[in-house]
Amino acid sequence: MLFPNGNKNDGGNMSKVKLQTAAEIGTLIRTKRREQHVSQAVLAGLASVGTRFISDLENGKGTIQIQKLLDVLNALGLGLYIFNRWEKD
């Protein structure tokens, strides 16, 4: 799968992906959830959030709560990396 910013989903071996929009975050969450064969309801339970939150997140809603996003990422075995975009990788 190709993300809107040109990143490719590498079948689960991804180490870093640069995401710039809520829609890209949602696409990544949906892709990873499906790769793990987890329903939205199960993921919501694992992350202690509602299924509506998972749906909103996967659909790119831009006003989600950061802690809930972190909880969902953690439930999927993912994390968030912040970097200075003006420095070289």
Give each language-model segment a name.
Residues 16-17, 27, 56-57:
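Short, contiguous strand/loop micro-motifs
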Residues 48-62:
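Recognition helix of helix-turn-helix/homeodomain-like DNA-binding domains
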Residues 27-42, 46, 71:
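Short basic helix-loop element that most often maps to the first helix and adjoining turn
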Residues 67-83:
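DNA major-groove recognition helix of helix-turn-helix/homeodomain DNA-binding modules
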Residues 1-24, 79, 84-89:
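N-terminal flexible/basic segments that precede or flank functional cores
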